[in-house]
Amino acid sequence: MNPYQMKKEDVLKMLGTDENGLTQNQAEENQKKYGKNELAEGKKKNPFILFLEQYKDFLVIILIIAAIISGVLGDIESAIVIFVVITINAILGTVQHIKAEQSLDSLKEMSAPTAKVIRDGEIKVVEGKDVTVGDIVVIEAGDYVCSDGRIIENASLKVDESAMTGESEPVEKQETVLDGEKPLGDRVNMLYSGSFATYGRAKMVVTSVGMETEIGKIASLLKSTQEKKTPLQESLDNFGKKLSLIIIGICVIVLGLELFRSDGINLTVFTDAFVFAVALAVAAIPEALSSIVTIVLSVGTQKLAKENAIIRKLQAVEGLGSVSIICSDKTGTLTQNKMTVQKIYFDGQIIDKDDEINARQGQLIIDGALCNDSVQKEGQEIGDPTEIALVNFSEKHNLPVEKMREKYQRLGEIPFDSDRKLMSTVHKIGDNYKMLTKGAVDVLSGRINEVKTMDGKRPFTAEDLAELKKVNTEFSQMGLRVLAVCERDVDTVDISVEDEKNYILLGLVAMQDPPREESAEAVRKCKTAGIRPIMITGDHLVTASAIARKIGILDDNGRAVEGRKIENLSDEELDEFVSDVSVYARVSPEHKIRIVSAWQRKGYIVSMTGDGVNDAPALKQADIGVAMGITGSEVAKDAASMVLTDDNFATIVKAIENGRNLYRNIQRAIQFLLSGNTAGILAVLYASFMALPVPFKAVHLLFINLLTDSLPAIALGVEPHSSDVMNEKPRPKNQSILTKKVLTNICVEGVVIGVMTMIAFYVGFIRNAEVASTMAFSTLCLSRLVHGFNCKSDKPVWFTKKMWNNKSMIGAFFVGFVLLNAVLLVPVLQGIFAVAPLTIAELLTVYGLSLGTFVIVQILKMIRK
């Protein structure tokens, strides 16, 4: 018999558990018996296959063809060295791919879903993979269901099972027994792994985990998530292909020019001409570009993770630098998320948090703590901060919540949702069933018939309503969040939203969630950086405005409005309306999407924060969706590009700063690589047009491109971050990474290095062509190593600490310098890399000319400054 056909008591008995859950020992035994609650992963690619895939790159294929033709034409040494260097690059690429997979696995581990289980009679938060058969799992709106289970307690739970059944509408769940065989979609007393709760709450007993779940049985049919290339990577790939095609065209022209100049065409002439063309191709193609960008993005992602921002989609790393609007929630993000009750209002009196409270006034506090889902166990507070504040206030005034909950057990409920802005529960108090409701004052004020007093109760008059609204406004203007607490008698525990009326008012509770200490500074940083912070909250307009003014989001030039103000505006009207609004209060998820879309239509890059299941559409709509790691639902995290592990607005600003620096570092690395390649191209073209011998062999350029260029480029990618990036305006949305400024730098610096290289060639040519080639190669190689220091900043770096603040760059220069000198001085390597021995004077000339490139570029930077 299937669990859905059995009584819940029988299911519990069959699984050896009860409503208090498993003990920790039982859970560990069951984990050994049933295994971890995770799907078997698809086989990862064999490292050898990964190695072979490195040869699929378009640029590498061109080099392989060049090597093969070189070998056929008799230049065996060049062919062998090209293959060796390409192989080394393939090995490095394979190792980097494996490391990237490991990094991705660690990030997945950091953002793994959790579950609330009852063990040893207490609610505990555990990783989803540690849930086991027999566990009692608490499911609330926004939670993913991480295993299959039978519902044993239900409070209006609705579940999105579209991942399992394809049904787009949420399914209403129940706990009653079902008769006969039922298809998956009709098993309404079961919950299945991969679905998520959209409304209400429930408890279930886990019946199967891992590959035994329904989703596990069809796991082979599920699409695995694959990391797509980011827009930057795609752009650079396309750039590389276009560059290659252009270079092939130029190579054909050079080949034709060389053949045209010759007296007659024979194998030797063709071989020499082809060597020229190959040298040009190798000089132009930035072999390491793609892998270096990947490495820099990977390192940047790890750095962001260490600073509490987990990147879930790699393109977010690039997008962070362009963010111009941050739409942020208030509670927990801009504030501390540590609500404390400051004042209560009862029967015309405002009572301070530290004043004595009598029994009548205490009933207001007790009702607030009973109509409440928060839990306190072993010093850990689980639940909504507002509800935790009510419980803490009750305990502070010697009204023990656990005893009250045992005495007045909850028999029914209507969970809170952002549309109703209310929560209701039913308890038996004395001989009567009482429905307790807490929620927004503006929602409840029109549903009150009577008011509790020190002497009993009386009718709720127009004067009472005016007083209630007045006190609510006063509290809100103080930046306090206000809840009304009401009660009424009911005849049954089966309540519905239609019963939420005809209340007796107990009073108001005013609490405060103070701003985080760092919020004001983060807002100031945003404004300096040309980023506009906007508060979007479900809270009261006056409360939101008070906090926004305190931290600097709202000033005399900004407006604060309620969400309903935008409901009747057309998209065109909304585009105009959003321009001067800094605070939106009482917003719905639909409002959030419209606000984000309006700014996007105006050409801005928008970041949006969210935590609830209803925030998922807005998070997906935003350019950078940011989910809360602590309070956020699994659905929100799944929709987001980035997850904050500390729920802190300041972390978003830090992430933007890191994103800007990362993008700038990638620009520096690209500028470094392409300016060096430009120098090589110019040198080869100059030699061709001047009918000089080819200045480099292919092996020389490959040595530079793949060995001595890669390390400085990676070092530039991890250049220490500069805070001055937050003094700049956001990068335009569709701006190419190869801006006019970067292209100018590439051309100018390429010319400088190219000129120095050809000077070295002419100096060496005094002796012979082999020495000329060796000096040109050495100067180009060392100039590019020195040029790494030029690319650290747009400003001069000589005589500054910035020159030496990157240990990776110093190390890269040292390694490259040692490798170059080994090639020049070790006889065996001289033969392999086709270099001639140099005299001390020639070697010093190479050093001097290479240093000259640094000096000239630094002088040009000073002139430009």
Question: What is the role of each PLM region?
Answer:
Residues M1-N727, I737-L738, V751, Y762, ...:
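Conserved cytosolic headpiece of P-type ATPases
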Residues T708, I753, T774-G788:
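Generic alpha-helical transmembrane segments
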Residues P732-G750, E770-T774:
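Membrane-water interface at loop-to-transmembrane-helix junctions
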Residues M756:
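C-terminal catalytic subdomain
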Residues C791:
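A C-terminal functional module that forms or caps the active site or interfaces directly
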